[in-house]
Design a protein with these regions (language model features):
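Stable alpha-helical structural segments in soluble proteins, enriched in small hydrophobic residues
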Residues: 66, 177-185, 210, 214, ...
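Glycine/charged-rich beta-loop-alpha catalytic/anionic-binding loops adjacent to active sites
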Residues: 19-29, 46-56, 111-119, 159, ...
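Active-site nucleophile and cofactor-binding loops and adjacent substrate-binding regions
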Residues: 27-37, 54-62, 226-236, 261-263, ...
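Active-site-proximal gating segment of KS-fold condensing enzymes and close homologs
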Residues: 4-54, 96, 101-103, 203-217
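Flexible, low-complexity linker/loop segments at domain and module junctions
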Residues: 187-188, 220, 269-309
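Active-site-proximal alpha-helical scaffold in enzymes
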Residues: 36-39, 44-47, 53-87, 125-146, ...
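Condensing-enzyme catalytic core mediating Claisen C-C bond formation in acyl metabolism
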Residues: 110-192, 306-309
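Acyl-CoA/ACP chain-elongation machinery
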Residues: 79-102, 106-122, 155-169, 197-204, ...
Length: 309
């Protein structure tokens, strides 16, 4: 989402206190550290991987967008297998200041600060982390006896063309995305939704309204939870953490809760699995994500049916 922030922040702070700074041999990795595809190159060199190298910079949807790109490459027959991932280490003053000035960070310093869908929510809690998945064509995976955790049914992404950060409270943009995503399906039945659930006033209402518009009364029967309630918002990798959480719900038949949901918001009145996990068979799951720049992405994941099922 924001590149090599630690290196850039260090150099920026150095420039502030030293007008005559000289870039010397010690700065040989400064350029590499700021490039978005440096991680790709280092991983491929370490693992001996060749082929397509792509770095997506789509903000907080980037991890899921990488999954979508890999999925489309495999569907088109261009790849049999690929590794996709997202990584973010934004915990530096430079990032805090940038996000704070637009008012999206929580001002709450307690352990309950990340509280998606709660009346008490007032911004997200920034975090860091890396998430990676191996995507593979089904027969290719079966031929090498790989463990298959789940199947990608479909992916789609849109831009709302509205605002860099603001979201319309009616949820229509996410609703339009879901209409496109589900167009190929004969039904809209979903067992679980892993929401973007960022703990901001705008986003959580935006998603809630979108779900209501698309699923109608059935939405009250679908459990929804936010991974960010427990691990914060890790920007680009957050959407992929959401996908992994949904995959593990499919594998384990357990849905993690939205913690810190102790004060209900009457406008956010769906089943957000408050505070305690639940046991439920999950045959398919929807994961949604939104990012600065007006990007909205979503993916449907499903349980793999073995031969004879």
């Amino acid at each position: 989402a924001i590149g090599g922030t630690q290196t850039v922040a260090d150099k920026f702070e150095e420039l502030l206190v030293n007008d005559n700074i000289i870039f010397n041999n010690n700065d040989s990795h400064f350029y590499d550290s700021g490039m978005y595809h440096t991680l790709n190159v280092l991983l491929k060199r370490k693992l001996g991987i060749k082929g397509i190298t792509t770095a997506l910079s789509t903000g907080c949807t980037a991890g899921m967008d990488c999954l979508g790109l890999g999925f489309e490459e495999i569907i088109d027959g261009d790849l049999d297998i690929c590794m996709i991932g997202a990584s973010e280490a934004p915990l530096v003053n430079f990032t805090y200041a940038t996000l704070d000035v637009i008012g999206c960070l929580s001002k709450n310093t307690s352990d309950y600060a990340s509280c998606p869908f709660s009346l008490d929510r007032n911004g997200f809690v920034i975090s860091e982390g890396s998430a990676f998945l191996v995507l593979e064509e089904y027969n290719h995976a079966k031929d090498r006896n790989a463990r298959i955790y789940a199947e990608v049914e479909d992916f789609h992404s849109i831009n709302n063309g509205n605002h860099m950060t603001n979201l319309k409270s009616d949820g229509l943009d996410m609703y339009e995305l879901l209409n496109i995503l589900f167009k190929k399906r004969k039904e809209t039945t979903i067992d679980y939704i892993n929401a973007h659930g960022s703990s901001t006033k705008q986003n959580d209402l935006f998603e809630t309204e979108a779900y209501k518009k698309f699923f109608g009364k059935d939405i009250y029967k679908i459990p929804i939870s936010s991974t960010k309630s427990m691990i914060g918002h890790s920007l680009s990798s957050a959407s992929l953490f959401g996908c992994i959480s949904a995959i593990m719900s499919i594998v384990t038949s357990k849905i993690h809760p939205t913690i810190n949901l102790n004060n209900n918001d009457e406008k956010c009145d769906l089943n957000y699995v408050p505070n305690y996990s639940i046991n439920k068979t999950v045959n398919n799951a929807l994961v949604t994500a939104s990012g600065f720049g007006g990007i909205h992405s979503a993916v449907i994941l499903k349980k793999v049916k073995e031969e004879g099922e």
